[in-house]
Amino acid sequence: MARFFRRRKFCRFTAEGVKEIDYKDLDTLKGYITETGKIVPSRITGTKARYQRQLATAIKRARYLALLPYTDGHDH
């Protein structure tokens, strides 16, 4: 039986020594939302709980300021 080794998940923010996640850093935030606009959970990304909370707040602020979409385009 073949064994599959999953890559070890690690927190990018801890590795880079980030203190605060900025809502204006759209390139980083876009990596943590799905194509439908949902926030990707930390069990998938490997982000630590502290940074996941900051990430969620930053994404919500960016959405409120229309920097990020709430959902996808819905083009049928």
Curated annotation (Swiss-Prot):
Gene3D superfamilies named in the record: Ribosomal protein S18
Keywords in alphabetical order: Ribonucleoprotein, Ribosomal protein, RNA-binding, rRNA-binding
GO BP annotation list: translation
Record InterPro entries: Ribosomal_bS18, Ribosomal_bS18_CS, Ribosomal_bS18_sf
GO molecular function: small ribosomal subunit rRNA binding; structural constituent of ribosome
Assigned GO CC terms: cytosolic small ribosomal subunit
Function: Binds as a heterodimer with protein bS6 to the central domain of the 16S rRNA, where it helps stabilize the platform of the 30S subunit.
Protein family per UniProt: Belongs to the bacterial ribosomal protein bS18 family.
Full protein name: Small ribosomal subunit protein bS18
Lineage: Bacteria, Pseudomonadati, Pseudomonadota, Gammaproteobacteria, Pseudomonadales
